[in-house]
Amino acid sequence: MDVLTRFNSGKLWDFKGGVHPPERKSQSNQKPIRHAKLVEHFYIPVVQHAGEAGNILVKVGDYVFKGQPLTQGDGLRVLPVHASTSGFIRAIAPYASAHPSGLATLCLHLEADGKDQWREQQPLDDFLTQTPEKLIEKLYQAGVAGLGGAVFPTAAKLHSAEKQVKLLIINGAECEPYITCDDRLMRDYADEIIEGTRILRYILRPEKVVIAVEDNKPEAVAALRQVLQGANDIEIRVIPTKYPSGAAKQLIQILTGMEVPSGQRSSSIGVLMQNVATAFAVKRAIMDDEPLIERVVTLTGDKVRHKGNYWVRLGTPIYQLLQQVDYHYDDRFPVFMGGPMMGFILPDLQAPVTKMTNCLLAPDHFEYAPPAPEQSCIRCSACSDACPVSLMPQQLYWFARSEDHEKSEEYALKDCIECGLCAYVCPSHIPLIQYFRQEKAKIWEIQQKAKQAEEAKQRFEARQARLAREEQERKARAQKAMEARRQEMKTAQGIDPVQAALERLKAKKTDNDSSAKVEIKTIVTEKGDILPDNSDIMAQRKARRLARQQQTQNTDVSQVETNEENKSTDSKSAVAAAIARAKAKKAAQQGSALEKDEISSSDTLSVGNDTEPVAEDPRKAAIAAAIARAKAKKAAQQGSAVEKDEISSSNTLSVGNDTEPVADDPRKVAIAAAIARAKAKKAAQQGSAVEQDEISSSDTLSIGNEAEPVADDPRKAAIAAAIARAKAKKAAQQRSAVEQDEISSSDTLSVGNETESVAEDPRKAAIAAAIARAKAKKAAQQRSAVEQDEISSSDTLSVGNETESVAEDPRKAAIAAAIARAKAKKAAKANNHDA
């Protein structure tokens, strides 16, 4: 049997459980509905329904008219809110909310200007001229929600049940004690309720429409029947008074005897229910173009002097509303929103009135007693017996306390209508309804998180699919463009570029295959292993390494020879300068008597086989002195520390074909040195004017005609150096005592039994002396340990039987000197090891 058959039978059914609490409705239903005074400040929450908040359309400082939308949603479940009066938006901020938690919610602070000026309205004379879809959209824009307590968006409810409804029920039962807003609304505005009911019938097109009213409201029933005047399109049925007969599922069961399946809506069995206050709001929204900005609120309780029902603008602070009815605040007695069974205590009286505010109850000590202390459950099953939904509240209580959400869902906690009967009958005074509400909130939060995660997953998958699709489209476009370019090239050149590239690749591969493969040499080890033969590579590496080592050795030898040549050149320059200074000093003394004897005696000295006289022209001596000074200055910068030793030893060397040793008499050496110094001093005084010319011409002079290198026998050079060092040392010790005597007697001394005059060419003698000094200096540094042996053996050796001039080739002399130095160093090292 379907729902219509059961309804048409005219029978009323009963539901399980239920109670008959004291009604106390007469306190507030005796007077018609009055209008509450407008307050100065309204706090309009952006969420006043079962859903989410819309987008705010205004900003601080904006002026708004009465009925102007303040928010706008993007779906039928996101209802807009409207300005309760005209004025200015002063703030958009959190404010106290009418909720058991007392949490703040976002509100629009509207300051009224007192004009209460409507926005432009467009009333509708006949709703039959509009389509149901347009009427649903208009209800949505008006912000109409269920005013029976659930505040579910009416437009969404109608849209979801369209063309599925067989029975439309207008709920006028109002079973909650103390609440009389629906009763007075049916009495005072029955015609508008009937008009709203007909609009709903036009939208839903049900087969039957019924207005259900409890039998404790005879005045309301009479008012409705009077408006209908015998019309049969809407039926009125009076039901027995029993709590909670006004609940949707219980009222359906009373009228049809059918229960709504668990977890489903009433539309699943072809039934839709709306509250009488909602029908009234539908009529105002469709016909009068008035959004939902006010509702009827019951103000009752012994703490309220002027009890009754009032039209209250949404957003009115509750405390200011209670003050209008002469409410006496007492912190011992709370104020309830809703009735004593399903209502809750307001944590803050500054909270505003919203769409769900149907009653404000302010009891005194006769009506309210503090809740008794909670005791342990005694498993009496009174709650189960009273539950109109046939649940097991005691089991749900344990699940809620242990937060066993799965068990709570398994025991159908979601079917609980929160009527409060279980707590009302509990002998242990357990606030079961509070536990169930908290458990529902936790489960809802978990489900929301899961829903958000699923939505995020779907968005991610959709994004991945979109990216993959875009990638495929991009590849397809690239392939298409490539094919187009290929076709263009083929058309222009007559050759397919892809085919040509493949042919080139094939030809290249053929060439590589036909080329000779590199033979890899291998060797076989004793164990029979085959390894690559790297002997050629190793030989090449060894050759490169030896070449680098040889290059390094050649560089070192050339560097040593260069250093030795530089030292030899510097020593020769210093020796030549010293001899020149001595001769210049002697030449400067030519004007005196001693000078003449020195000159005459100097003619008897012979240096070698030279034939050119040096002292015949004193200008030559001056030139030589200038050259000597230039060289001496340079030598002084490089070796000032050894200058004196070089000068003192310069006159002790044998220059020519001497038959006797030059230094048999050390006095002769000292005399020669003194003469050289005197001549150098005089030449320095006379030759300053011609110094530059002398220096410029110094490079053109010849060193001599030496016949053979001094170092034909390197041992002779070493012996000569040793003799020179010994004589120089001895002469240095005697110079200080006999210097004056040596100078005075210098004219009468003979240097040796020489066969030719020494003064014929003094430059040759200077060269020979410089060579000897350089050798002596080198040998002195290397052979200090064997100096005495060399001196003792020097007397038995002959220096030379030289028949040719030493200075014929100065380069040969330098080479001989370098060789002599190297051999002397080697001999010194050998002697040191022997010692």
From Swiss-Prot:
Q: Where is the composition biased (Polar residues)?
A: 552-561, 648-657, 745-756, 793-804
Q: Which residues bind [4Fe-4S] cluster 2?
A: C387, C416, C419, C422
Per the record, the GO terms for biological process are:
electron transport chain
Q: What PROSITE patterns does the entry give?
A: 4FE4S_FER_1, 4FE4S_FER_2
Q: Which segments show compositional bias classed as Basic and acidic residues?
A: 468-489
Q: Where in the cell is it found?
A: Cell inner membrane
The note describing how and how many cofactors are bound reads: Binds 2 [4Fe-4S] clusters per subunit.
What cofactor does this protein call for?
A: [4Fe-4S] cluster
InterPro entries, A to Z: 4Fe4S_Fe-S-bd, 4Fe4S_Fe_S_CS, Ion_transpt_RnfC/RsxC, Nuo51_FMN-bd, Nuo51_FMN-bd_sf, RnfC_N
Sites where the protein binds [4Fe-4S] cluster 1 = C377, C380, C383, C426
Which region ranges are annotated with the description Disordered?
468-492, 540-574, 586-618, 634-666, 682-714, 730-762, 778-811
Give the EC number(s) under which this enzyme is classified: 7.-.-.-
Domain 4Fe-4S ferredoxin-type: start-end pairs: 368-397, 407-436
What keywords would UniProt list here?
Answer: 4Fe-4S, Cell inner membrane, Cell membrane, Electron transport, Iron, Iron-sulfur, Membrane, Metal-binding, Repeat, Translocase, Transport
Membrane topology reported for the UniProt record:
Peripheral membrane protein
What GO annotations for molecular function exist for this entry?
4 iron, 4 sulfur cluster binding; electron transfer activity; metal ion binding
The source's superkingdom equals Bacteria
State the family it belongs to: Belongs to the 4Fe4S bacterial-type ferredoxin family. RnfC subfamily.
Q: How does it assemble?
A: The complex is composed of six subunits: RnfA, RnfB, RnfC, RnfD, RnfE and RnfG.
**Database matches in NCBIfam families:** PRK05035.1, rnfC
Function, please?
Answer: Part of a membrane-bound complex that couples electron transfer with translocation of ions across the membrane.
Q: What name goes with this protein?
A: Ion-translocating oxidoreductase complex subunit C
Q: Gene name on record?
A: rnfC
